[in-house]
Each structure stands twice: as C-alpha cells, then as structure tokens.
Amino acid sequence: IEKGTIDDYKALRELHYRSRHPGMVRAIYRAVVGEELAGVIVYASPHPVLRPRNAALPFLREVMREGMQSYLRWINEHFVRISRVIVYPKFRGIGVAVELVRQTLPLEGRPYVETLAVMAKYNPFFERAGMVRIAAGADPERRRSLGAAYRKLEELGAREDVLLDPELFRLWYRSHSRREKGEVRDALRVVGEYWRRKGAQRRVPLARAASRLVMLLNPPEYLIWKNPDPEYSGYPEPLSVVTSPPSRRPSS
C-alpha cells in the first residue's frame, strides 16, 4: 500500500458501480501486487450534513446550533471521507480492500474518517478494517410504500436495470398502453412525495423517479472510524451500532 495519483484512480474508475465524480479529492493511495496495480482508495472532503453522522456523534447537534458556517468548518477540519475503494477483479477475494482501508485510515491526520457505501451491506470489508457501521433507523411506512411501488413496476415488466437507466426506462415506458402508463405514474408518485418532503419544489421527471426508487430502497450504509492516536483522545467515541431492519434489495 503506497501513495497513489489521480492516474491510478482513472485506471480503475470504470470498475466502480458509481460513475459520478468522487468529490473533492484529498488523497489517493494504491495497492500494488508485484508490479500490477491491484486497487485504489480515494479520500475526499466530507458531505456537509449527514443524519447518521449526528446519530453516531450527538455532540455535533450542539455544534450545528452554534451556526451552520462554524459547523461546516468543524466538519471539514475534523473529518475526511472515503469516497472510492476499487479493486481490480483479478485481485478480489484476497483482502486488498480491507488492507487499503485499514492501512490508510490513520494517514490523513483527522480524528474521524467516514464513508457512505451501498456495497457495505453485502461486503463488510469496511468493518473488517476497523470502521463502525451506523445503520439509521428506516421509516417502516415509507419502506412499505416504496416496496409496493417497486412490486407494481415489476408486475408491469420492469427490471432493475431498466429502472436505473433513463433511456431504457423511456423505451420501456413508451411500450405500454395508456392505462399501464397511468399505473407507472401512480406507482412512482411516492418518489415525488418523498422529495417534496425533503424540500424539493420542482416535479421529479419520471425516468429520474424510477432510478431514485431503486436507490431509496437501497440506501448507502454509513460507517465511521475514530483515530486511536493519543492526539485525538479528547474527541468523543462514536456511539455503538444503531440497528435497523435489513434493507430489501429489489430483485433483478
């Protein structure tokens, strides 16, 4: 495990399930096996506000009450975020991801390291590397509504890959009768209601609502690590794992 560059990330980025930019990059490290690039880990600036972060560290609510500007400054100074962990397929299954996380966690000199990752539900390598999972409690009624919407779209023939790809979704949607299109719109209305509750004012486009439905049913896991260096002994430890019902992963 050694210091890497943006070129190392670019060499493997197509293998990651998220194609968007990893954020404001602070550091990149790479794993090398022999002479081959086996994996990369990208550290980036933290997200401004995260509910599970406040659940793990309740004192942050007090910091927030002092003003958003000072809160954001505090978060940027004391947190760093793992934005990407990518392992080349040839080297998967031998612990590369665990070592990329474990060996680099202390290197950024922050009291806290955090990450949001959907795949953490299915591959607990972050926890094996020493991070603590904070599973925010899900709203059972909300999950039932989203699940019912997904099942309705399944009945109409939608697969997960169709819902996630806007162009495939549009083609699939156009292939249906007027009555079936109405059923699709009715099913996806629950997503629009969700975003209006979050403060969005504009109507959510249908194709975007379809992809959001899948994402809302598969929210990312939040994990946090407290630096054990004596320099950070005065910072609070994250609370124990908050359990919640396991998320339902829609079938493909």
Which role fits each region the language model picked out?
Residues 87-106:
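Conserved acetyl-CoA-binding loop-helix of GNAT-fold acetyltransferases
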